[in-house]
Amino acid sequence: MKRKIEQSIDTITGVLSKWNDVDTIVLLESGEDFYDPYFFISVDCYCTGAIPPSHTRRDLFPGAVAFESLHASRKDRFLMRDIPFRIEYKDQSYFDSLLHTGEAPEGAFRDTGTYMLYRLRHGRVVFKRSDWIDEARKDLDALNQDFWNMLRTAFQARMEHFLGDLHAAIAREDQLFYLISSSGFIRTACSVLFVINHRFEPSGRLLAAETRELRTLPDSFLGRFDSFLRTNPSLKPSQKGEVANLLARSIVAL
């Protein structure tokens, strides 16, 4: 299976690298192996210009089946040799601006935290036309404290916003909004902790495990974290709200 995966990667890389405006191709594997339910291969294609339209791309990958293209976000998804691939075409100038100015466009980290920077920093490079990726990674390693402070302020405010929503949902006994606000709260709480540790966030699939391994965590964090995540009918929503309060206060105090 490993060989089949690498052959498929080579095929896809061979197609993408022929496009003049593709500068760098980076891979991340999700899941421990092919039989892991989380398994798929994510391909980040950093571009300096236009890419072929979706109907053209569909015909360029030999053997690809179940091809789907998301026009709004410039993403392709398909199977090749039964292996799930997801390709995202990214504007290289966007990252240049972010890294050189140290300022992020509004909403840049809203939904996935710093995961896009994690991908840029830790993905496996399978093609590069220039030294752009090497320089970008140097810039990521040299981000100053002002950048991290900016992120902490933004993520902390969002965490507190979700905490307020969580308590409102508990008071109204709104089960759907309770789930939405619980998810938003714990996700942004993790975002704050990664920023405090000057680390970029992994994917949601790895977030719980890597959060537990962070060097700087509040006292009693792990027990509260596990209590908040645990599905336990005996833990009332109001009690979970109190756990969320304790988590938030301890994180803000770091």
What positions do the PLM features span?
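Hydrophobic transmembrane alpha-helix bundles
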Residues: 54-69, 100-118, 208-222, 235-249
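Metal-dependent nucleotidyltransferase catalytic core
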Residues: 1-109
